[in-house]
Amino acid sequence: MLKIDLHGFTYTKVKDILPEWLITNYNNGIDDFEIITGNSEQMKQVVKSICSENGFRAEDDWNGNSGSLLVTINLSLIHI
């Protein structure tokens, strides 16, 4: 699982870098990510929105840590 820590990033910077980071790493064969957001609910919402817009889904509290999100590809969007 690949991780990125967004502590210290502005919402604008996250909106600029995260979509490409997710897509590039997914295209390189990585299909699950831990995104460390800290406890900011607004940052979590920004990340969830970016994930949704780019075909990923983000889960809260997946490891008992409320400061990170588990991000995976949204399989319901894949048409076979």
Question: Across the structure, where does each feature detected by a protein language model lie?
Answer:
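Loop/turn elements at beta-strand to alpha-helix junctions within RNA-recognition modules
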Residues: Y11-T12, N39-E41
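Short beta-strand
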Residues: E59-N63
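Active-site beta-strand termini and strand-to-loop segments that position acidic
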Residues: T72-L75
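Conserved small/polar residues in nucleotide/adenosyl-binding loops
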Residues: I78-I80
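Short, flexible loop segments at boundaries between secondary-structure elements
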Residues: G64-L70
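Conserved helicase motor "Helicase C" RecA-like lobe of SF1/SF2 P-loop NTPases
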Residues: E41-N54
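An N-terminal amphipathic alpha-helical segment
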Residues: M1-I30
